[in-house]
Amino acid sequence: MTNNDAAVEAPSSSRASSSKQQPKLEITEKVRVLCLHGYRQDGDAFKNKLGSFRKFTSKYAEFVFISAPHIAAPLESAAEPVPEQRSWWANKDDGTFKGTNKGGPAFGFQDSLRLVEEAWKTQGPFQGLLGFSQGACFVGLICGLAKKKLTSIRPEFAVLSSGFVSGSLVHMSAYEEPVSIPTLHIYGSSDEIIPKDMSALLASHFKNVEVLEHGGGHYFPATAQQKQTYINFFQDRLQEYLEHLELQQSSSVSFIESGAEDNDDDGDANDAEVAAATAAAGSDLDDSD
């Protein structure tokens, strides 16, 4: 929760029992987004890289960054691993990862999925996911798994920058059903690490898609050219979230009022039963005289 959180109390019902208290719904004034970094990054590095982006959208969204559980294999076999260089999974037999690799394994993927599920549960609530490169690939997989109810994560929207479809065979089933949540797909026309066609292919697996293509390479753009797109996207997501909470609150109030009416009906029935019993008793007394 942010410091801007506010509690909204449901309107009281004159028919509700005084012993019953109306529920309180906490309205989060910003949507909360769990962020997944790229290969050989970590949560802190990714957070720093998204400084301008976070500033653009700070009115509407709060971003939480976590780090992958695996240390990436060193670039050279004789080199020492760098703790700050993290990996969500490896898709090559030598323990490294390459986005363009096809048909390889997914070493460590389940560990990473459990970590993200735990973060979603313990650091939430969250409404959305955001990822860059391998992290965006991961976000796409999570959305597909959520569609099939194969993960406890339930994103309401997602942002995928320089994303791609995983080539690992064990991931193929995650792309079997199109995903309907709103998504923003960001990619560069000059990206040589993840060519834009790969990112466009990932976008094709979603139904409610907005695409932001920039003229650069493999990075998350955050200049004045992209600012309004980001603001509009998160403004819409916040509006949807608040409307959902308003509907939820309305349903809760209706449920309580319905319960109060049932109690009143029960009371009326009891009164009728008492009156009938009293009348019957009086009749018996008259007969005995």
From Swiss-Prot:
Citing just one GO molecular function, the answer is: hydrolase activity
Q: What class of enzyme is it?
A: hydrolase
Q: Which GO terms describe its cellular component?
A: cytoplasm; nucleus
Superkingdom in the source lineage: Eukaryota
Any one GO biological process: response to retinoic acid
Q: Which UniProt keywords apply?
A: Hydrolase
For the region Disordered, give the residue spans: 1-24, 253-289
Active-site residues, Swiss-Prot/TrEMBL: S133, D191, H218
Indicate, by first and last residue, each region the UniProt record lists as having compositional bias (Low complexity).
Answer: 1-19, 272-283
Write the Enzyme Commission number(s) for this entry.
Answer: 3.1.2.-
Q: Where is the composition biased (Acidic residues)?
A: 259-271
Look up keyword Transport and say if it applies. Answer: no
Which cysteine residues pair off into disulfide bonds? none
Family to which the UniProt record says this protein belongs:
Belongs to the LovG family.
Q: Spell out the PANTHER family in the cross-references.
A: ESTERASE OVCA2
What name does this protein carry? Answer: Esterase GA18864
